[in-house]
Swiss-Prot record:
Residues 280-291 have a biased composition (Polar residues). The lineage of its organism: Eukaryota, Metazoa, Chordata, Craniata, Vertebrata. Residues 259-269 have a biased composition (Pro residues). Poly(A) polymerase that creates the 3'-poly(A) tail of specific pre-mRNAs. Localizes to nuclear speckles together with PIP5K1A and mediates polyadenylation of a select set of mRNAs, such as HMOX1. In addition to polyadenylation, it is also required for the 3'-end cleavage of pre-mRNAs: binds to the 3'UTR of targeted pre-mRNAs and promotes the recruitment and assembly of the CPSF complex on the 3'UTR of pre-mRNAs. In addition to adenylyltransferase activity, also has uridylyltransferase activity. It is an enzyme of class 2 (transferase). Adenylyltransferase activity is specifically phosphatidylinositol 4,5-bisphosphate (PtdIns(4,5)P2). GO terms for biological process: co-transcriptional mRNA 3'-end processing, cleavage and polyadenylation pathway; mRNA 3'-end processing; regulation of RNA metabolic process; RNA 3'-end processing; snRNA processing; U6 snRNA 3'-end processing. ATP binds at S205, N392. The keyword ATP-binding applies. A zinc finger (Matrin-type) spans 16-46. This is Speckle targeted PIP5K1A-regulated poly(A) polymerase. Associates with the cleavage and polyadenylation specificity factor (CPSF) complex. Interacts with CPSF1 and CPSF3; the interaction is direct. Interacts with PIP5K1A. Widely expressed. It comes from Homo sapiens (Human).
Length: 874
């Protein structure tokens, strides 16, 4: 218990922080749940194992360089069992010998002198170092420590200053950039010996001006017009001492950088050598390095590495080729490419000092050789056919030079998206796609902040006309030759506009083109030079140069919907005084609530539940029946009223704990035609807006833009009347993408609703409360009830009324099993707000009160149950 107490510290403003796992909890029950969780228990066990390992180990030096681990193991076996021997393979001057038990270690230390092969060994206890939790190894590009970030941003004068300070906290330091340049120079020198005239180009985060601590070092080995390489001698297994000394990588230069682990300089003494331990201290502000230089040697073989997935190559500009490239490549070229890739891997493995964990990935869409560089702590990859990615990186760098607001916006939105669970690998947005989305947004401002790619191509001078793989990559290299933008909007306004615009863009029904600086409608067809080969999806974002590549083709419908929901919630928050002004009561303000990581419940809140196609009035009526009759919810319809833009702050004027949670209407919807491409109309231009008022006695729990435990405005929206495709009305493209039934629904809507001249209904929202866990054991209870009534699936349950009656009986039985009767005057087990919009027929469920953490289970149940229920009631 004492060890547990030492891992936990109380926070000044309430809550607790687990120093071992770097996790903050809001209260004691949450802390107890964390301490009993798998992650914390694993780290406690790992720390105990590391401590026991240190108590059984000795530090050995003074042996000849040709002595291997087997010889050392044989010598120390005379004192007892030997568990392992870890050698310093780079310099071969020391080793750590782990004995089988503490008694064997004491026997080794009790002997005053040790000798091996005529050389006197220096043996002493292994130094005990403070345990460094692997939990601190956050994903690449992760934000600094939350306390450091909060303190730095809270001291800023305004939101714009916060965004600029965030860039300073996340970008590479000058020493880290110099370190990467030294590694590139080292690679250039080595590869020139094998491929005279080749050039090693860094690309990606290292040069596109959006670098972060710990980002990979992406390299493009440009062989130029080099024909098939001449046979080269077999690369040595490990670099010699002469080659290490002859390399341009100055060990002292590495040692002076904060990113360098302790083994970045040759040890002057055995005491210095012992700094190379199993655990290397790491920081969220420094490049992530392996656990230790020594322990990583056991993982040096490709077989010990996890299999590389082509999705991992899609994170940055490196994934810019056509999807059919590999399939169309002749087998002979594939074989030659694989052989060249193996040759590059052999050179890295045998001739570059400090490189380890080399792995060739020929099956990736862009074949690469992955590597780690121990002295610098960098992870990287080398590709042979990625010239297009190099120009993409230079284009992003040019955009950041054209306007000083680009970098703060991109850094802020990357950090926000990471906290919302929107960016990453697999079906999530890549950092490259998110950056292009920001650039497209800035191109569509009025006046524009950035020029379109077509405009840049026209201004390319002599020597800047470039064509790569048939794509025009021409643009000026010098930003000073271009006129600056006349747009002078502050950073805080641009950030709020981004959230508003993305929340109402038709992501599936249009193609966001950076080359044209506008959204091209998908349904109407596109010119062949813009359309051919491009794979459409829920989010269509065209690469600026490879026009056949949709950089967001991997994004799923659920992620695209969650992106717009999170943007809608953030846009609502950006209209509040909490975003615009520093809090006089010490509360988080400005960027801080936006950058707080979301809890699982808030991520689910932003994940919409797709519903079957049906007229909106029929859909809302069916939802009310399901919640009230089938599930036994106490349900209240939200009311609407109109207020002035500046009126009220959302706090109740009444006493007690009752709060009035407001929901601003979506007022920043894109207009049709030209204005849709320019941005969102009505930003700040309306004097009165709609809001939804829900009188509740609970607080909204950790919505997407709020810090845990902070009350605030409920970020739901009511639909507004507008043109087809806008917020509040389903676009025909959105309905058509659902297949033949979608076309029928589109016709039904046009004839049944719009044809009658009826106004479009606004979004419907309900506050629901549950007193029993009616989602648990429901299938078993239904089966038991069917057996008792002997109706089964073929009886009255097959009708609409019969299905409702059956589900109501199932709910009543589950209430009886849980014990007690429903009493509205008592506090409910769980309360939430359900909201559905006619624009997309997606249901959003937001928790209001969830003291027992049951919302994730309920949300998972509703994802399956509600669509089936609507089909029964149609």
């Amino acid at each position: 218990m004492a060890a547990v107490d030492s891992d936990v510290e109380s926070l000044p403003r309430g809550g607790f922080r687990c120093c071992l796992c770097h996790v903050t909890t809001a209260n004691r029950p949450s802390l107890d749940a964390h301490l009993g969780g798998r992650k914390h228990r694993h780290l406690v066990e790992l720390r105990a194992a590391r401590k026991a390992q240190g108590l059984r180990s000795v530090f050995v030096s003074g042996f000849p360089r040709d002595v291997d681990s087997a010889q050392l193991s044989e010598y120390f076996l005379a004192f007892g069992p030997v568990a392992s021997v870890v050698m310093d393979k780079d310099k071969g001057v020391f080793a750590i010998v782990e004995m089988g038990d503490v008694g064997a270690r004491e026997a080794v230390l009790s002997q005053s002198q040790h000798s091996l092969g005529g050389h006197r060994l220096r043996v002493r206890p292994r130094e005990q170092k403070e345990f460094q939790s692997p939990a601190s190894k956050s994903p690449k590009g992760a934000a600094p420590d939350s306390h450091q970030l909060a303190k730095a941003l809270a001291e800023a004068a305004d939101v714009g200053a916060q965004m600029i300070k965030l860039v300073g906290l996340r970008e590479l330091s000058e020493a880290e950039r110099q370190l990467r340049s030294l590694v590139v120079a080292l690679m250039q020198e080595v590869f020139t010996e094998f491929f005279p005239g080749c050039v090693v180009h860094p690309f990606g985060s290292s040069i596109n001006s959006f670098d972060v601590h710990g980002c990979d070092l992406d390299l493009f080995l440009d062989l130029g017009d080099l024909e098939e390489p001449q046979p080269v001698p077999k690369a040595p297994e490990s670099p010699s001492l002469d080659s290490a000394l002859a390399s341009p990588l100055d060990p002292q230069a590495l040692a002076c950088t904060p990113a360098s682990p302790p083994d970045s300089q040759p040890p002057a003494s055995p005491q210095d050598s012992e700094a190379l331990d199993f655990e290397t201290p790491s920081s969220s502000l420094a490049p992530q390095t392996p656990d230790s230089a020594l322990a990583s040697e056991t993982l040096a073989s490709p077989q010990s590495l996890p299999p590389a997935s082509p999705l991992l190559e899609d994170r940055e500009e490196g994934d810019l080729g056509k999807a059919s490239e590999l399939a169309e490549t002749p087998k002979e070229e594939k074989a030659e490419g694989a052989a060249m890739l193996e040759l590059v891997g052999s050179i890295l493995r045998g001739c570059v000092p400090g490189v380890y964990r080399v792995q060739t990935v020929p099956s990736a869409r862009r074949p690469v050789v992955k590597f780690c560089h121990r002295p610098s702590g960098l992870h990287g990859d080398v590709s042979l056919s990625n010239r297009l990615a190099l120009h993409n990186s230079r284009f992003l760098s040019l955009c950041s030079e054209l306007d000083g607001r680009v970098r703060p916006l991109v850094y802020t939105l990357r950090c926000w998206a990471q906290g919302r669970g929107l960016s990453g690998s697999g079906p999530l947005l890549s950092n490259y796609a998110l950056t292009l989305l920001v650039i497209y947004f800035l191109q569509t401002r009025d006046p524009p902040v950035l020029p379109t790619v077509s405009q840049l191509t026209q201004k390319a001078g002599e020597g800047e006309q470039v064509e790569v793989d048939g794509w025009d990559c021409s643009f000026p290299r010098d930003a000073s030759r271009l006129e600056p933008s006349i747009n002078v909007e502050p950073l805080s306004s641009l950030l709020a506009q981004f959230f508003s615009c993305v929340s109402c863009w038709d992501l599936r029904g249009s193609l966001l083109s950076l080359r044209e600086g506008q959204a091209l409608p998908v349904a109407g067809g596109l010119p062949s030079n813009l359309w051919e080969g491009l794979r459409l999806g829920p989010l269509n974002l065209q690469d600026p140069f490879d026009l056949s590549h949709n950089v967001a083709a991997n994004v799923t419908s659920r992620v695209a919907g969650r992106l717009q929901n999170c943007c809608r919630a953030a846009a609502n928050y950006c209209r509040s005084l909490q975003y615009q002004r520093r809090s006089s009561r010490g509360r988080d303000w400005g960027l801080l609530p936006l950058l707080q990581p979301s809890s699982p419940s808030s991520l689910l809140s932003a994940t919409p539940i797709p519903l079957p196609l049906a007229p909106f009035t029929q859909l809302t009526a069916a939802l009310v029946q399901v919640f009230r009759e089938a599930l036994g919810c106490h349900i209240e319809q939200a009311t609407k009223r109109t207020r002035s833009e500046g009126g009220g702050t959302g706090e109740s004027s009444q006493g007690g704990t009752s709060k009035r949670l407001k929901v601003d209407g979506q007022k920043n919807c894109c207009e049709e035609g030209k204005e849709e491409q320019q941005g969102c109309a009505g930003d700040g231009g309306e004097d009165r807006v709609e809001e939804m008022v829900i009188e509740v006695g609970e607080m909204v729990q950790d919505w997407a833009m709020q810090s845990p435990g902070q009350p605030g405005d409920l970020p739901l929206t009511t639909g507004k009347h507008g043109a087809p495709g806008e917020e509040g009305q389903p676009s025909h493209a959105a309905l058509a993408e659902r297949g033949p039934k979608g076309h029928e629904a589109a016709q039904e809507w046009s004839q049944g609703e719009a044809g009658k001249g009826a106004s479009l209904p606004s979004s419907a929202s309900w506050r629901c409360a549950l007193w029993h866990r009616v989602w648990q054991g429901r299938r078993r209870a239904r089966r038991r009830l069917q057996q008792q009534t002997k109706e089964g699936a073929g009886g009255g349950a097959g009708t609409r009324a019969g299905w409702l009656a059956t589900e109501a009986q199932v709910t009543q039985e589950l209430k009886g099993l849980s014990g007690g009767e429903e009493r509205p005057e008592t506090e409910p087990l769980l309360s939430f707000v359900a909201s559905v919009s006619p624009a997309d027929r997606m249901l959003t469920v937001t928790p209001l009160q969830d003291p027992q953490g049951l919302f994730p289970d309920l949300h998972h149940f509703l994802q399956v149950f509600l669509p089936q229920a609507i089909r029964h009631l149609k």
